[in-house]
Amino acid sequence: MVSRFALLLTLPLAVACAPVAGGGDALSSPAPDAEGALFVAGKFGNTLSKVDLASGEAVKTVDSCANPHELATSPDEKHVALACYGGQTVDIFSTADLSRVASIDLGENARPHGIVWHANGDLYATAEGRKSVFWIRDPLGEAETFEFGSGQEGTHMLAVAPDGLHAWTTNLGSRTVSLIDLKTRRAPQSVEVGEEPEGIWLSDDGDTLWVSARGSNAAFKLDPQTLEVRQRIETGNFPLRITVRPQGDYAVTSNLSDGGLSVIDTATGKVVRNIRVSGPDQAEAKTQLTILFSPNGERIYVAETMANTIAEVDFASGRVLRRLPGTGGGDGLAIIE
């Protein structure tokens, strides 16, 4: 069982083959077929790092901001935005050399956490300390900010509609999920979804909202417009993140207490396999948090925050291929090709 100390650090088909954790013990071994770069927010070291995926090496690390958490890359992949959870800004860095190009102030006690860089070019971020969501229009230009209250405690992670008209948030303290209208400013709609809902992901077609509730050991399929729960799916223990494969065929939860991943068929809502990353015996030592698919859906990256590593997992086999550097307590992840 993961200790309260480790948990507090997280706040501020049948199986075709048995899941394995084989390999992956060597840090930064080369992967000739891997391309692009992985960006890692070091929330304990207050850093931002760039990892070259071909070599598996960290090619640059810079000072970022206080307690940085989630990351998002721009549509053109030239910039990466960082939510400064220990402060009140969203900071933007060049993906080429990690130079800071902008710092957008969201106001006193903002504590931004979840962040989305939308295909429309705008940024969206939760401001947990203000119980709100910010829409940042033209972040690399005038950076106009518009604030929308959630009225909920612990507004932590978010998803944004393809048309940019609505956002959805998980609110840890209130045990709710909220639907926020980003145009008309009508009162947000909030419903309770399990215990401590944290992970959230909207399907590409906007038809299904996925939520993982870490205190319920479950994932939920919701109607995005009514917030009605369509299906509850039992997962591994403490699923604090959920993501959907770019192909849309599987949803995956990051299970902190198991040191593993639950793979859910999005069509049936059934768990079809479980992938062991570090396993229950190393779960506390590793403290597995954020998960992120490669753009082609072939690999999934798993932040092991207390170990300062990022596990690279082959999605088809469930094999841990290698462990990449996750300097400074790596948590938030972003990727470019």
Positions of the model-derived regions?
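Predominantly soluble domains enriched in secretory-pathway, periplasmic, or organellar proteins
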Residues: 17-337
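Positively charged n-region of N-terminal signal peptides that target proteins for export
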Residues: 1-5
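Bacterial N-terminal signal peptides
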Residues: 6-16
